[in-house]
Amino acid sequence: MAGHLTSDFAFSPPPGGGGDGPGGPEPGWVDPRTWLSFQGPPGGPGIGPGVGPGSEVWGIPPCPPPYEFCGGMAYCGPQVGVGLVPQGGLETSQPEGEAGVGVESNSDGASPEPCTVTPGAVKLEKEKLEQNPEESQDIKALQKELEQFAKLLKQKRITLGYTQADVGLTLGVLFGKVFSQTTICRFEALQLSFKNMCKLRPLLQKWVEEADNNENLQEICKAETLVQARKRKRTSIENRVRGNLENLFLQCPKPTLQQISHIAQQLGLEKDVVRVWFCNRRQKGKRSSSDYAQREDFEAAGSPFSGGPVSFPLAPGPHFGTPGYGSPHFTALYSSVPFPEGEAFPPVSVTTLGSPMHSN
């Protein structure tokens, strides 16, 4: 390392000064930083990193100027790197509070300002803040009222012995629209949207008033519950009757109303039951016929792989069989044109499963 420094910097006079002349510096060691920051005579080329011949001499590509941080904020502006000075003078130290060493300001005595928000955006935000306080206060007040009413509704419902489903059915009796148990539950838990809570609150408020004043509301609710709980029973047809209907369907898939009435009278069924059975049977026949037609078309067209299985050996070298699938080294493919007899690669059938093979 010392030899390298000696070959580069030892006995090297600064540019522009003679080493042997009177008053010149004596040959000896020169500090590289002093030599690099040396400024030549006025009018002469200055030596420094990134200035004039400096980058070409040292073979260093010019790099972007460093950023100067003022108060923790970076600004973008024309800057000059450290050690870059204007021609015609030496570097001079600058007092604190001004720009850094070698940094040119974009205005006389004014430091660059950091990027700030545009005044228009600030004005819009202020206008929004001036308009929103009243609306936000109203919304908060409504939210508090909804919370209190939800608690009151739950207490009143439990006290009077109503379930959430009963409340929904009673609303249907009073206002013609039945609400589900889930809706009432979500209202009490404040899980509905603010808009839906506001829409549902007047109806529930009337329900609370009716529950307090109307003594027959409980009976009305029970009657409505029975009506809603009564469901249409699933029709069950005996096998003997189903067989007779199947025979009649084969004779006439689409009977008229008179024929349906006659069939229902003979079999002891209701007209609607017979009509629905024939309708369902026709739909079932359409589905089965379409599936059968598709299968026939596929068989008529033939499989795209009509040729027999053809086995091709893998590339030479160690192979590892797939665990659980035996040890064949042949990949079975299907060719549309089978190989004629006597040619290479006859089909090979694998009947046994072997353990995985490993090469040594």
From Swiss-Prot:
There is a cross-link at residue 123 (Glycyl lysine isopeptide (Lys-Gly) (interchain with G-Cter in SUMO)). GO terms for molecular function: DNA-binding transcription factor activity, RNA polymerase II-specific; RNA polymerase II cis-regulatory region sequence-specific DNA binding. Residues 138-212 form the POU-specific domain. Pfam families: Homeodomain (PF00046), Pou (PF00157). A motif (9aaTAD) lies at residues 4-12. One of its GO terms (cellular component) is cytoplasm. DNA binds at residues 157, 164. Sumoylation enhances the protein stability, DNA binding and transactivation activity. Sumoylation is required for enhanced YES1 expression. Ubiquitinated; undergoes 'Lys-63'-linked polyubiquitination by WWP2 leading to proteasomal degradation. Its main location: cytoplasm. Residues 180-186, 193-196 are annotated as: DNA-binding. Residues 1-51, 88-114 are annotated as: Disordered. InterPro entries: HD, Homeobox_CS, Homeodomain-like_sf, Lambda_DNA-bd_dom_sf, POU, POU_dom, POU_domain_TF. The modification Phosphothreonine is found at residue 235. One of its GO terms (biological process) is regulation of transcription by RNA polymerase II. Gene3D superfamilies: Homeodomain-like (1.10.10.60), lambda repressor-like DNA-binding domains (1.10.260.40). Keywords: Cytoplasm, Developmental protein, DNA-binding, Homeobox, Isopeptide bond, Nucleus, Phosphoprotein, Transcription, Transcription regulation, Ubl conjugation. PROSITE patterns: HOMEOBOX_1, HOMEOBOX_2, POU_1, POU_2, POU_3. Residues 230-289 bind DNA. The modification Phosphoserine is found at residues 111, 236, 289-290, 355. It is found in: Cytoplasm; Nucleus. Interacts with PKM. Interacts with WWP2. Interacts with UBE2I and ZSCAN10. Interacts with PCGF1. Interacts with ESRRB; recruits ESRRB near the POU5F1-SOX2 element in the NANOG proximal promoter; the interaction is DNA independent. Interacts with ZNF322. Interacts with MAPK8 and MAPK9; the interaction allows MAPK8 and MAPK9 to phosphorylate POU5F1 on Ser-355. Interacts (when phosphorylated on Ser-355) with FBXW8. Interacts with FBXW4. Interacts with SOX2 and SOX15; binds synergistically with either SOX2 or SOX15 to DNA. Interacts with DDX56. Transcription factor that binds to the octamer motif (5'-ATTTGCAT-3'). Forms a trimeric complex with SOX2 or SOX15 on DNA and controls the expression of a number of genes involved in embryonic development such as YES1, FGF4, UTF1 and ZFP206. Critical for early embryogenesis and for embryonic stem cell pluripotency. Belongs to the POU transcription factor family. Class-5 subfamily. The POU-specific domain mediates interaction with PKM. The 9aaTAD motif is a transactivation domain present in a large number of yeast and animal transcription factors. This is POU domain, class 5, transcription factor 1. The gene is POU5F1.
